[in-house]
Amino acid sequence: MTSEHTMLTGVTDGFFCCLLGTPPNAVRPLESVESSDGYTFVEVKPGRVLRVKHAGPAPIPTPPPPPPEDDPGVKTGLVRCQRRITVYRNGRLVVENLGRAPRADLQGRSGSGDPPAALEVELAEPAGGDTRANPGSGRRRRPRRPKRTIHIDCEQRITSCKGAQADVVLFFIHGVGGSLAIWKEQLDFFVRLGYEVVAPDLAGHGASSAPQVAAAYTFYALAEDMRAIFTRYAKKRNVLIGHSYGVSFCTFLAHEYPDLVHKVIMINGGGPTALEPSLCSIFNMPTCVLHCLSPCLAWSFLKAGFARQGAKEKQLLKEGNAFNVSSFVLRAMMSGQYWPEGDEVYHAELTVPVLLVHGMHDKFVPVEEDQRMAEILLLAFLKLIEEGSHMVMLECPETVNTLLHEFLLWEPEPEAEPKLEPKPKPQLLQPEPAPGEEK
């Protein structure tokens, strides 16, 4: 089929879209069924069905040997999380790290350094303009009273998550326009290592149902879908892996279920800022216009999402369903990205260890945003992949799989409790002899 015929078909379908009011390739809701090819169709709400890839190792007939008893004098994987977050009325945020974060344990090339003792962030412009005193004016700025102060003081036990451990589940969440197919290399890799994996298609993506109402694609609606999937498959130690927009849902679940989320992996997720849809965006155009522009959008995604634009990348874009979604769903997804709660304070409150993976050729997410995320998070490790871009899990699957696996196996170095030295016995003082007496 020629490109001219493809463009003509897109224009024709766009006119039908304007006349009929619905996109011609709308996906109808599916029944909740268990398929024989490893997919499950879960009805999270009446008429709202998500396709889920759920795979894992075969059940072990004999129970594994009991783990060795820990030395009572050694705190294995125990991390003390101490942090004070102060929000001022003028929009200033001060984050003070009061404890020692174990960031140096996973350091290497392109890793993040030790967190600063205090981090100051400007959340928003103060109402009423800039109230700071001019330099050289001789006036001193009055100290502002904090709007609220958040104290974090808890202990986290961070352990190695190995394959075939019955209490470990890996959740993979894709972003806008993708599907669970983008995780194929990661799903196959970790299943071979004995891990249990869960990967859903977001509503309107892949083989999940596509409601024809924009409210079905707001952040809150999609977050509740992910909550339903998480609570259905979660076990004791759960690891969340998100890509792009999917990182926001991982953050949401980690904040909602701190006792169940053991580790988080964010791949090209961006900075720790609240979500707000752009008012001046191409995605605000009518659905029929977006449908006519779909070939151009796909080409733009290939240019921005991949470091190279060769035959291999075009095949990955097609087979991996990296950008394959109806114009209606795309428009609703972009306009529904409203999440004011997910700001810097929200991210600073997380105490779960986080691995940040960034492809250096990413034109959607600048590296400065992931660096900012690493600064805000309490336990964060940033890894940069020089030859990768936004779809780094498709471009560099071996590198990504290695980084993810190393992070799953990582645990902090045990800290032995300081041994108490025995106190010296008190010496009895002899009375001084009286004058003239012999000693």
From Swiss-Prot:
User: Where does this protein chiefly localize?
Assistant: cytoplasm
Which cysteines in this chain are paired by disulphide bridges?
A: none
The answer to keyword Hydrolase applying to this record is yes
Q: Where is the composition biased (Basic residues)?
A: 138-148
What's the Enzyme Commission number for this chain? 3.-.-.-
Question: Its GO biological process terms?
Answer: negative regulation of NLRP3 inflammasome complex assembly
* Assembly description: Interacts with NLRP3 (via NACHT and LLR domains); this interaction is enhanced in the presence of NLRP3 inflammasome inducers, such as ATP, nigericin, silica, or alum. Interacts with ZDHHC12.
Name of the protein in question: Protein ABHD8
Q: What is the lineage of its organism?
A: Eukaryota, Metazoa, Chordata, Craniata, Vertebrata
